[in-house]
């Protein structure tokens, strides 16, 4: 089973600190096109699941055109599931309001949920101020051969919104911790069983 992991696309970010409004609009169009190309790549490579670990959009500024562009790309690849956990820049409620969400676009909420694909279990949760401390004890125990956990936050020794306490996830039978928020690729050993 092939899985593709992405995060922090920040679609429709204003980007006007270092760019003119026209340059920012062009860059945002390129980011949407990159997402659409990624879905085509996933289709060509027979990817079964795309993990979107937060900050797909950049706050309330996201346009209807961008949301429709994302959902159209998802609809064009119905054989691929897109698992999405929102991040600190996402405004999930407004972005998807009045949109028909395709069946293959699955959103994690502020409660743990697990989706299974044969012997692979993928669990995810949106970190909020109400669950930031308790989510580590509430992580569903999975007996699958491969266990993946999706979170959006910075590696930390604390528990809070936008923070992932790596120490509290060690020894929990996690094979891959799919993170967002960090804006850089890395692959580190989490414990003897897993990487992040």
Model-assigned labels for residue ranges:
Residues 1-68, 141:
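N-terminal active-site segment of His-dependent metallophosphoesterases
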Residues 49, 58-196:
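His/Asp/Glu-rich metal-coordinating catalytic cores
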């Amino acid at each position: 089973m092939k899985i593709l992991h992405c995060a922090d696309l920040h679609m429709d970010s204003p980007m006007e600190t270092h760019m003119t409004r026209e340059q920012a609009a062009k860059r945002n169009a390129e980011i949407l096109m990159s997402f659409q190309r990624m879905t085509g790549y996933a289709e060509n490579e027979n990817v079964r699941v795309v993990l979107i670990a937060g900050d797909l959009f950049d706050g309330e500024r996201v346009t209807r055109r961008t949301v429709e562009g994302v959902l159209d790309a998802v609809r064009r690849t119905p054989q691929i599931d897109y698992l999405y956990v929102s991040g600190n820049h996402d405004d999930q409620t407004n972005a998807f309001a009045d949109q028909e969400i395709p069946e293959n676009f699955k959103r994690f909420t502020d409660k743990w949920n697990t989706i299974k694909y044969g012997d692979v279990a993928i669990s995810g949760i949106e970190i909020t101020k109400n669950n930031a401390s308790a989510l580590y004890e509430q992580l569903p125990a999975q007996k699958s051969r491969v266990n993946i956990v999706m979170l959006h936050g910075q590696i930390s020794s604390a528990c809070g919104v936008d923070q992932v306490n790596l120490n509290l996830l060690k020894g929990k039978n996690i094979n891959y911790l799919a993170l967002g928020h960090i804006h850089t690729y890395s692959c580190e050993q989490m414990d003897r069983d897993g990487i992040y």
